[in-house]
Design a protein with these regions (language model features):
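Basic, low-complexity segments
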Residues: 1-56, 432-435
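Basic, amphipathic alpha-helical segments enriched in Lys/Arg and hydrophobic/aromatic residues
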Residues: 251-257, 344-456, 460-479
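Basic, low-complexity intrinsically disordered segments
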Residues: 2, 42-69, 73-141
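Function-dense linear segments that define catalytic or interfacial modules
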Residues: 39-43, 50, 78, 236-241, ...
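Helix-centered, glycine/charged polyanion-binding patches within enzymatic domains
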Residues: 188, 296-376, 380, 479
Length: 479
């Protein structure tokens, strides 16, 4: 028989030994250790100090280090909203310890996160990004020789049905009802009007329509192919290490190639500041991008700076006689670079590293559908997300794991490897006394079949480096 459990009445005094201890969370302990390795707390406080009053009047503000740590929790826990981040930090004992709060302390509310976000200017977020980028450079994770650039899509916190006409201020549904009435449909019949709206060809433009709740959001196409209000995040990534060199959110109706040279040169500025080198130092040798970035004027600017443009031409069999001599030379150099063996290798690395950077931030980091409004707010959050992604790369360098899921997968992988070794050892014992050549051939077959089965049943890809070292050890022992 069980005993019903309910919340006991509150007590006036509680012994310290009776308090709940934080659960051991190796990931956040390693994250804190990584932050301490480059003195993140003191440097972040000095960067944020100008945004706070020095008079000492009133209630002291929340430590900005706590604010950035809470954003890290949101990134690693896949929580997009500030309300959700605040609730998670308040509920978890281990995260409270990571933030520096005990059981009796009150963690910051979601409204506090909003106030701090608005208080800190964009330049502070940029400096925090450079602070972590500098830490990557000290561990050899910043080369800055070959870079790749690409954009993705963020769904805005705004609805298409809330659009207003810029000229007449007519609401979207009023506009649809008027069109339905002109086509002989009763405007009071909601189902008929919705059916009419679903079947009619959409001809909405950003020049004609605006969302009153988020004027910066633009009408565009999402990753799923649907029409929605969107923004465009952009990354410039180091193709040798995968580190994000420059990140920003752009308006959803901007062309990809707009200001390409400016964004690449901004990445170079970030590299110079992170490496503490001269402002005119140029380390970038090549830029890889897809066809959407093919713009003659932008490529001409990059080539004039001595940067190789590995960008495919979207126009097949382009007639260069329609271009002037200088533009034709720029297009020819870009095409030659994209078709070369080294250029194709850079394009493959570009696809790998850029997808690897977008997926943790947008899909696993909860930023694919934003809860914020306004280009400035999105840029602040996205800059921090890019910095945290770089921080996870540094953790992978130091500890072999960069996210809580990777830490959990590593533990499972080690268990599966141990089980595979035990089974292989059992097979070795059974095969004693046989021909050594037959034993080695049969043993290898059993080993890799066993490991392949374990990987298929468990963590695909996690055992790759473990199985490789295991094979080398078996070869060296002559089994």
């Amino acid at each position: 028989m069980f005993k019903p459990h309910s919340l006991p009445p509150p007590e006036l005094f509680i012994a310290c030994s009776s308090l709940v201890r934080p659960a051991t969370t190796p990931f956040y302990a390693k994250l804190d250790q990584t932050l301490n390795s480059f003195d993140f707390a003191d440097q972040a406080r000095s960067l944020c100090a100008p945004a706070y009053s020095e008079t000492g009047r009133g209630r002291p503000g929340i430590d900005p280090v706590v604010y950035f740590k809470m954003l890290m929790v949101g990134f690693f826990e896949d929580i997009a909203s500030e309300r959700g981040i605040a609730e998670r930090c308040s509920d978890s004992i281990s995260i409270r310890a990571f933030l520096g709060y005990d059981l009796t302390g009150t963690t910051p509310d979601h409204s506090t996160l909003s106030i701090i976000r608005q208080r800190l200017g964009q330049e502070i977020y940029e400096q925090v990004f450079l602070l972590i980028l500098s830490a990557l450079d000290k561990h050899g994770l910043l080369k800055g020789k070959h870079v790749g650039i690409d954009t993705s899509v963020i769904q805005a916190n705004a609805a298409l049905k809330s659009l207003l006409n810029r000229n007449t201020e007519e609401a979207y549904w009023e506009y649809v009802r008027r069109l339905a009435s002109e086509n002989g449909i009763d405007p009071k019949n909601t189902e008929a009007v919705r059916e009419f709206d679903r079947k009619r060809p959409k001809k909405m433009s950003n020049e004609e329509w605006v969302n009153p709740y988020d004027p910066d959001a633009k009408i565009g196409v999402t990753k799923a192919g649907a029409t929605d209000m969107i923004y465009k995040p952009e990354h410039t990534v180091d193709l040798d290490t995968g580190a994000i060199l420059q990140a920003e959110v752009r308006l959803g109706d901007e062309a990809d190639q707009k200001d390409l040279s400016l964004h690449v040169l901004q990445a170079q500025v970030n590299i110079n500041q992170a490496q503490n080198t001269a402002a005119d130092n140029l380390t970038i040798e090549s830029t890889a991008a897809d066809k959407g970035y093919h713009a003659v004027a932008e490529m001409k600017q990059l080539q004039a700076e001595g940067i190789r443009t590995v960008i495919s031409d979207p126009v097949k069999n382009r007639k260069r006689e329609n271009l002037d001599i200088e533009d034709a030379r720029v297009v020819r150099k870009a095409k030659r670079s994209a078709c070369s063996k080294s250029g194709k290798a850079l394009l493959r690395r570009r696809g790998m590293h850029l997808e690897r950077s977008f997926a943790p931030i947008l899909d696993a980091g909860g930023a694919r559908r934003t809860t914020l409004r306004g280009l400035v707010n999105l840029n602040k959050r996205f800059k921090v997300s890019a910095a945290i992604y770089n921080l996870s790369q540094l953790m992978r360098k130091l500890f072999g794991v960069g996210t809580p899921k990777q830490l959990a997968a590593m533990g499972k992988a080690l268990f599966l490897l141990w089980r595979a070794i035990v089974m292989v050892g059992r097979d070795l014992w059974r095969m004693r006394g046989t021909n050594p050549a037959e034993r080695q051939s049969s043993l290898y077959d059993k080993i890799w079949l066993r490991l392949a089965r374990e990987v298929a049943n468990g963590t695909t890809g996690t055992l790759g480096w473990i199985s490789h070292s295991f094979k080398k050890s078996l070869t060296s022992t002559g089994c």
